[in-house]
Amino acid sequence: MSGVPFPSRVIGDLDYSNLLNIGQEEAIRCVLNAYPNIGLEATNLGRARRIVQRALNDNGMDGNKVMLAYTSNLISSGLRDTFACLARENRIGAVVTTAGGVEEDVIKCLGDTLVGDFALNDHALRNNGLNRVGNLLVPNDNYRNFEDFFVPLLRRLHEQQRDSRWTTKTTPSQIIAEIGAALESVRPNDCGSSLIYWCYRNDIPVFSPAFTDGSMGDMIYFYNYSRKGLVVDPVPDVRRLRQLGCKSTNVGRITCIVLGAGLPKHHLLRNVQADAVVYVTTGSDADGCESSCNVMADRANGLLSPNCDVVRVHGDATIISPLLLLRSSDGKEKVGVREDGN
């Protein structure tokens, strides 16, 4: 804009009268296309959409990679199928999550997760065998089913280690891949909705640096209490993630989609040299921690390179993520084509 000494453009109004006179699908497309010029957080969402759409379309082409980081509550929510679709269509090249981000995906193959209310009485939930994830409810039976599924897998891995006289060191990502294979064998009718299954099928590594921080950690502990010698070694996973994200060995563009903050965000960005990063977070600068600090702090702390293209969208990922990933075309175009055609 003339006379303004920094990048800017005229605000674009959303023509609400027009939205009332067109079909729902076209109206959604118009709103998505309008986001970059609306201002405030809508502009950040519009900018983030353009990065995400282009990256998903280009994943695997010319060495380009998309890496997804998410917190466990998101896989507990209805976003699970969205993530599974990205893996099924090979739109992502690696995943970083918490232990719960693995467990809750598998648990949904074994039982239903319910939607309740944020204000439900916690004592009553506990007395009725229900666990809370915000307003989501997970019955105790689901975790018992998960134990029945997971312990035999540990037994097989332990036997492999013992037979190799412990020259075989099992990493968290290898265990997660074994979980995907077990789902295909044990739950063939349910595994099609699982992110972990599709990552296994398409050889997409899933990294979980805090693998023992959850139900799987409990089971590994109790298994080793009665049967000594099961070893889980996370160090090779760090090396593998760094190799995937090292610019000196990759000619393509690396884009990181970070949904939520905490461990997944920090572990991914500290080990990957990203060209573009999209954050979706409700974290506040006042937290004073690297997992939810702002873009300037992340640059200062070395998580982002000076030339990294970064957009931080402040909001609930269950609301923002579908808008980032939703195609605004009529379905004839490939995923990721930008609205402006560029």
UniProtKB/Swiss-Prot annotation:
A family per Pfam: DS
Key words, A-Z: Hypusine biosynthesis, NAD
Pathway as given in its UniProt record: Protein modification; eIF5A hypusination
Phenotype upon loss of function: RNAi-mediated knockdown causes cell growth arrest followed by death, loss of DHSp expression and a failure to sustain infection in mice.
The keyword Iron-sulfur appears for this protein: no
MF GO annotations: deoxyhypusine synthase activity; enzyme activator activity; enzyme binding; protein homodimerization activity
One record GO biological process: positive regulation of catalytic activity
Any one GO CC term of the record: cytoplasm
Residues the record lists as binding NAD(+): S72, N73, L74, I75, S76, T98, A99, G100, E104, D213, T282, G283, D316, A317
Quaternary data: Heterotetramer formed by a homodimer of the non-catalytic regulatory subunit DHSp and a homodimer of the catalytic subunit DHSc where DHSc appears to bind spermidine and DHSp appears to bind NAD(+).
Main function: Required for the activation and stability of deoxyhypusine synthase DHSc. Required for cell growth and survival.
Family, as annotated: Belongs to the deoxyhypusine synthase family.
UniProt-recorded name of the protein: Deoxyhypusine synthase regulatory subunit
Taxonomic source organism: Trypanosoma brucei brucei (strain 927/4 GUTat10.1)
Protein encoded by which gene: DHSp
